[in-house]
Amino acid sequence: MTFDVRKILEQLDTGTPAEAGVPGWQQQSWEDPDGFANALAVAHVGKGAPLKSRAGQHYDFFHDLVVRHANTDKIALRAYDKRAGWQVLGYKQLQEQASRRATEWTQQGVKAGAKVCLVYSVGNELLISLAAALCVGACVSFLPPTGRRFIAKRLAALGPDHIATEPHQLLLLEGFEKQVLQHKGKGSPAFTSHTYKPVEPLGLLFSPLVEPSGTPAPLVAEDAWRGALVDGLLTFGLGAGEHLAAPGYHPLQHVPALLFATLLRGATYLHLELSDVEVNPALITEHPVRALGVTPALRDVLLKARTPLKNVAHWFRNPEEPIDWHAWRTWVKECALAAVPSANVLVDPSAGGAVLTTPRRVRDLHVEAFPAPGRRWELHDINLSGQPAPGDLGIFTLVPPDKRPPGYLILTRSYGLYHYGGPRTARRVGRVYPAAEVAEAVQGLPFVRGATVVPAPTGGVAGHYRYVLLVFTGAQARQPGPWLQEIRKSIELQLGAEHLPDRVDFIPLYPRKVDGQLDEAWCQTEYMTGALFRKSADPLFQALTALRGHLLEKGGPNV
């Protein structure tokens, strides 16, 4: 098939579709992703330096993402620091520092194919180490420095050969100190970058979309490169030197995909912590933003401050976020975005980038979500039989399915359009909630006699749930205030604040146990039917609980 990339870009930039529904070129790209990638690669270079990568043959990420732009004054990363203000990392500086770090790493035994886990917050050090890992040819993994239990479980599952982090994060890496790489900045910058084969693993990523939680999912080089190519050029429409920003976007879901898309275009990733925007919403307006990712939390902050976003060329949202129609429409009106194009964009890190998108257009809020350009996909039976969906509703599945994590979201097709239909099972904004880890994190508290997490449907938009932590406290005198503080503190320290449950219910009963383990199915059924609530208020069950407490806890709560 022939793809006229110039016309495609004109359609996307003007927001004027040539036809209703999914554009014809996008449907053709699903059938011929190889031809589509080749056409994009030619158009992508434009007047810039040529790519070393060849679609379907080999991929030199370090050259195409970093070296190609190093002879310019372009900025790779612009990040805000609450103490020092805006900090920048240029492509030239990135190349030099990453090359030195790659040399240091090879002297410490890092080889092509080695599993290197990057434990960083988003910032200069992450970008330098990511580029160094690509230069060496490592298989990259990424973990933000959250809680100890969260990191320890994932490092144990990954079994990394090496870990790169900053010195002040070493306390989070107990048991893995021997794998930590040293950074002295004394390596030679002369280093020949690695070329990945198409099916060579470039990453093992802890995608929050993969079940069970904490399972590393492979990202092959071809998916990473094509994802960056399509997203940089089409999804976000980035040009050299333009900014992509996504404050508050989940790092495990969007790193490294957003970074790859930005760097391949020679653009600038604008990093802002949501907490900094809450303090000073005007920060988001200090630089022109080509593409702005907006979460409900960022929307509410900007709406409260009535911040006019005249510097934003277009914005996008994750279709898996709860959709408050009134709040979104009010935000668009109050922040001067009524004439600004928008899109829905869902990123899957193990697929290398966006898997569901819509063209950038000036229009009202919607739940449309088209399979991304250049992706082979199918609708599968929602019963997970593996057969194609018999109708126009099914599980969105990337092809070939046997080499990828199982699909989880429902896509519907109607009158030539595709709509997001929610996840097949309970999730939080499409992400797997680590319910077992949350329960384990509070199980050791002295007042806890049992804990489990129950997902409860919200009753609103399909597929949205609230997670309720049930804490059984037995016959103890109730102290909900202090208990809640201890629970929050324990979860934040061990797993990170993002994993706090939506609600905590203290149950003044003893849970049912089978072979010494909490019967989670019983707990969920009793809670959802209201039986636990009724028993808690029943004088008979209160007396039985007091008697059981007297008998069981003579030697301590675990007797």
Name each region found by the language model:
Residues H63, A76-A114, V119-L127, F150-A152, ...:
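Conserved AMP-binding/adenylate-forming core of the ANL superfamily
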Residues D73-I75, L181-A228, L234-L244, L337, ...:
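Conserved pre-ATP/AMP-binding loop-to-beta segment of ANL
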Residues V136-C139, R226-H243, P251-R290:
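Conserved AMP-binding/adenylation subdomain of ANL enzymes
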Residues L143, I163, T285, L292, ...:
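AMP-binding/adenylate-forming catalytic core of the ANL superfamily
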Residues R376-D402, R413-Y415, Q479-P480, L484:
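Conserved beta-loop-beta connector loops within the AMP-binding
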